[in-house]
Amino acid sequence: MSAIRYELIKTDKQTGARLGKIHTPHGTFDTPMFMPVGTLATVKTMSPEELKAMGAGIILSNTYHLWLRPGEELIREAGGLHKFMNWDQPILTDSGGFQVFSLSKMRDIKEEGVHFRNHLNGDKLFLSPEKAIQIQNALGSDIMMSFDECPPYPASHEYMKKSVERTSRWAERGLKAHERPEDQGLFGIVQGGAYEDLRAQSAKDLVSLDFPGYSIGGLSVGEPKDVMNRVLEHTTPLLPANKPRYLMGVGSPDSLIDGVIRGVDMFDCVLPTRIARNGTCMTSSGRLVIKNAKFTHDFRPIDENCDCYTCKNYSRAYIRHLIRCEETFGIRLTTYHNLHFLLNLMKQVRSAIMEDRLADFREEFFEQYGFNRPDAKNF
């Protein structure tokens, strides 16, 4: 029996978007869901209790980084990632593939795996489909990812075709290496860039392997938003309706809503935490850069429509002062706000699906946020 089970609760009559639940060994979370990223077994500056309070039903950790520091065997010795970081709800781990291809400029892709350099100290390393699964088995995450090749954007059709074929072979090898299928659900990752025929081939290959869930990778890597939406419209109908669909690396408010409309259940991105560290905030009326001089004497909250801890207690002027002085508390406040904003947005999206009005909600949100303006500022 699979460790992961998807339960469809409702389909939005306006858009076809899905409202559901995903059941895991460490509990159930609602979908659509945004997953905060805890790269090194922590969501930067946030405690597990704060994440739970703001509605994070699942978080993500990074296989590549945890393999290098502190090492998967130490985490296994601690009783697994949940005990190590004191998080008793679901955890998803990526395969490390994206980091191998994005952080290491020196890499050699072979059929057996990838030879590359440690981005911290230059040491030679090797990661294979089997090794990526072994590390994740040691970490003990609820949802694991297959090891995939992450081609650059743009890439030629010829290169992408070879990459998709290799990713399919690697997915099959990873599935065979998986030692804990009753405890951990392994997802296959659909690749293929912007080429619809290759996306179809990738989806067909992976669906034939009967994974408990499917990820859509290789998007949000520099392609225009309309290309991403076109690829999603083509790809999600090719995936089983009774299993979860996860769009990797997407976290801007507009892309979350548009992804849900196109049948996606799960999202993750470092965006809300990364931009928070330089003082960029998501608000109901658009992007706000707290360092700007115009906020020096502004004693309003970051977002007057937000009820998060930050907005209930602190002013723009105070947070601007903290960020300009590089005080950690300022980063905590902006991080808390941005994560709360996205998690609350997904809560609103779920309510809109329940009420069969997601298309109306999108129109209202885009209008208020300013996405419909020609000078719209996105992330």
Curated annotation (Swiss-Prot):
Keywords: Glycosyltransferase, Metal-binding, Queuosine biosynthesis, Transferase, tRNA processing, Zinc. It catalyses: 7-aminomethyl-7-carbaguanine + guanosine(34) in tRNA = 7-aminomethyl-7-carbaguanosine(34) in tRNA + guanine. It is an enzyme of class 2 (transferase). The keyword Metal-binding applies. Its EC number is 2.4.2.29. SUPFAM superfamilies: tRNA-guanine transglycosylase. Residues 249-255, 273-277 are annotated as: RNA binding. The active site is at residues 94, 268. One of its GO terms (cellular component) is cytosol. Its cofactor is Zn(2+). Binds 1 zinc ion per subunit. Pathway: tRNA modification; tRNA-queuosine biosynthesis. It comes from the Bacteria. GO terms for biological process: queuosine biosynthetic process; tRNA wobble guanine modification; tRNA-guanine transglycosylation. One of its GO terms (molecular function) is tRNA-guanosine(34) queuine transglycosylase activity. The keyword Glycosyltransferase applies. Zn(2+) binds at residues 306, 308, 311, 337. Belongs to the queuine tRNA-ribosyltransferase family. Catalyzes the base-exchange of a guanine (G) residue with the queuine precursor 7-aminomethyl-7-deazaguanine (PreQ1) at position 34 (anticodon wobble position) in tRNAs with GU(N) anticodons (tRNA-Asp, -Asn, -His and -Tyr). Catalysis occurs through a double-displacement mechanism. The nucleophile active site attacks the C1' of nucleotide 34 to detach the guanine base from the RNA, forming a covalent enzyme-RNA intermediate. The proton acceptor active site deprotonates the incoming PreQ1, allowing a nucleophilic attack on the C1' of the ribose to form the product. Homodimer. Within each dimer, one monomer is responsible for RNA recognition and catalysis, while the other monomer binds to the replacement base PreQ1. This is Queuine tRNA-ribosyltransferase.
